[in-house]
Amino acid sequence: MEASFENGRKRSSSSSSEEESAFSFAMELAAGSVLPMVIKSAIDLNLLELIKRGGEEGASAYELAAQINAENPKAAAEMIDRILQLLAAHSVLTCRVETPPSRRRRYSLAAVCKFLTRDEDGASLAPLSLLVQDRVFMEPWYHLKDVIVEGGVAFERAYGVHAFEYHAKDPKFNKIFNQAMHNQSIIFMKRILEIYKGFEGVKSLVDVGGGTGASSKMIVSKYPLIKAINFDLPHVIQDASPHPEVEHVGGDMFVSVPKADAIFLKWICHDWSDEHCRKLLKNCYDAILGNGKVIIAESTLPEDPNSGPDTIHAIRGDVIMLTVNPGGKERTEKEFRTLALQAGFKRLVKVCAAFHTCIMECHK
């Protein structure tokens, strides 16, 4: 009887623990927007960069409030302290309490802030956070349910135009978007140039949809013999700074692509439908000189669902594409191979992967 009672108590305890865990997870999901919005506010206030300047000592909320020109420093410090406690609870920051008499909390950067504060090249993922939490980017989510029931694209329902058409109408948002892509590209390309050797021997390169040219500039810095073209829509390249080894060319990739030994497609295919991608890849096929290649950099969905970080990143991106771009989606490696073959290529091979992105090559 005693053993039976003990087993029952253990089962009850286990059940209670599972229920507590499930409740906590449900609460986290219900309030899921709080953390990213607080991170956005911290970035807007430059708090992470200010804490970084404090080095190992970090900074207190009162020290930070004194540096942001707040009209009421004491009230600002109290509010800053409250949002920094949330960031510390989520391991974005670390926190320690000063010795008496002050007993103030001091905050330092946790490991993740390596990517949320500017690196030696001035790049970080902070602009990406500002983009994803921007009002323009947030509004389409309120239309997702409607387009599932009634059809259409959430972004177009919100603004009446395709996302890339909207950029040309809203210079402020276009700049926010370009800054996010520019910074993310620098971080990603720095890693890719360490592990991917496929640019060796290339004499000419076109970066299709290359934005303001961050990737092209980094490629030619490592491979100075490459003649590079940064190819994007005219309103995009207008924000591109000049570079002696990179030519900025405006155009429409669905009409034609400049000719080169290699064509680079980084985070482009996921913006478009299969039909658009076949057209783009066919244009790339026609533009490749000799035995050149197309280099695709994209997240890839797994054939079998799992909850690994690469999968979570890809599926999250897929749902963003669902909301923003008509026909846009993430794909499996098999789906990319099918598109490449349909465009005329003989084969597609996966070469390497980094930061949740696969590098694949299409060969004639």
Curated annotation (Swiss-Prot):
Pfam families registered for this protein in UniProt: Dimerisation, Methyltransf_2
Gene3D superfamilies to which the protein is assigned, alphabetical: Vaccinia Virus protein VP39 (3.40.50.150), Winged helix-like DNA-binding domain superfamily/Winged helix DNA-binding domain (1.10.10.10)
Entry's Gene Ontology molecular function annotations? O-methyltransferase activity; protein dimerization activity
Regions annotated as coiled coil: none
Enzyme active site = H270 (proton acceptor)
GN (gene name): OMT3
Quaternary structure, per UniProt, is: Homodimer.
Q: What is this protein called?
A: Flavonoid 3'-O-methyltransferase 3
